[in-house]
From Swiss-Prot:
Reaction equations catalysed: a 5'-end (5'-triphosphoguanosine)-ribonucleoside in mRNA + S-adenosyl-L-methionine = a 5'-end (N(7)-methyl 5'-triphosphoguanosine)-ribonucleoside in mRNA + S-adenosyl-L-homocysteine
Protein name: mRNA cap guanine-N(7) methyltransferase
SUPFAM superfamilies found in the cross-reference section: S-adenosyl-L-methionine-dependent methyltransferases (SSF53335)
Biological function: Responsible for methylating the 5'-cap structure of mRNAs.
Species whose genome carries this gene: Kluyveromyces lactis (strain ATCC 8585 / CBS 2359 / DSM 70799 / NBRC 1267 / NRRL Y-1140 / WM37)
GO (cellular component) term, any one: nucleus
Cellular location(s): Nucleus
GO molecular function: mRNA 5'-cap (guanine-N7-)-methyltransferase activity; RNA binding
Source organism, top-level taxon: Eukaryota
Annotated site residues (mRNA cap binding) in this chain: K172, K178, R203, H250, E344, Y413
Family note: Belongs to the class I-like SAM-binding methyltransferase superfamily. mRNA cap 0 methyltransferase family.
Chain coiled-coil ranges: none
Amino acid sequence: MVLLPEKPVWMSQQQYEEQYGSLLKLKESEKCNHEDKQLALQPKESSIGYSTQERIAKLSVPEVQDDDKNSKVRNRKHQRFDLEEKKKKLRLQKTIEEQIKHHDIEMTANRVVNVDHVVRQHYNERTFLSKKHNRNYSPIIKLRNFNNAIKYILIDKFTRAGDVVLELACGKGGDLRKYGAAGISQFIGIDISNASITEALKRYHSMKNLEYQVILITGDCFGESLGVAVESFPECRFPCDIVSCQFALHYAFETEEKARRMLLNVVKSLKIGGYFFGTIPDSEFIRYKMNKIPESVEKPSWGNSIYKVTFSNNEYQKNGNEFPSPFGQMYTFWLEDAIDNVPEYVIPFESFRSLADEYGMELELQKGFNEFFVEEIPNWVNRFSPKMREGLKRSDGRYGVEGVEKEPAAYFYTTFAFRKVRDYQE
């Protein structure tokens, strides 16, 4: 029997037919064969006997009542059967989707396809799912609050009133209000997920008192020149004062070519004296975890009940606890209610700093989330709204994260900021 996944709501019919065209044809052929068999097995009508109405008319009253009771019992059985069938169908659907995703990840790990396809599909799907859930009931709500606090502080630290901001991989526009508080004059957001950009536009139109221009564009920030994406938007005021990238830069380190294209996009978009800042996985924390895993483990992994990191091979351990290359060191990252086993890439920070220097940028800041938060929170606690302060409060009355959320929030990520000091000559 041909198993065919249902079309996701965010996928167009054309994309669905392109991806599963061969399966659709097999399914149609199977359906026709099944209908032919059913037709052949169907009993022919007998000319002898009574019609349904005539049979009911001949029944006595007690027989009709018994038939009603039996009918209700049968209906209940059918309802239970239908419910079980629905559950089976959902389980089967989930299994098929997981198999397809596993296949896509394997293809990415073997470099048959690049990571863009998997990333775009994941964030299109997450955008749809997020509409159905109230984030206030998220199991990682404290982690989200902590990450937002880090971004608020970073934005305030490097952004000035009147600045023009370019955000790479802007997602659903979650930082629009943060930039509003900084008093910027223009925000240019670019993201590879068209569903995320659509949601960002809705968010922007629903906001009040945002006194700056917002331009949202679907485009590839890492794989191609930004000129391709922004050429239809002459209102963009390049060069910018700020380029920001939050929790997404790791996708650029799939290859050296991508990492260099990303940095070229940054320096071409940025004024001399402007800042490039963001948040990335902390390569030193990843090394610390990997160093504790023996070479005998083929697929090193670690995590807890809300997050998990899994490498596709143990080349790091075989190479004397060093990554064989600064690029293409893939792992899958799962975070409860946020990231569903999406391929990501290690950003060895010294390699990142060296490349940035080559492109005319000097390092201004690099601190892990925990260190950065501990240093900055005394100056910020009274600047946050009461709701934000409450969202950051731990069970001991202090501010930050605790329990299972602490590792993926406070230790897995680091902040960075570079300042452009000279133009890059290609």
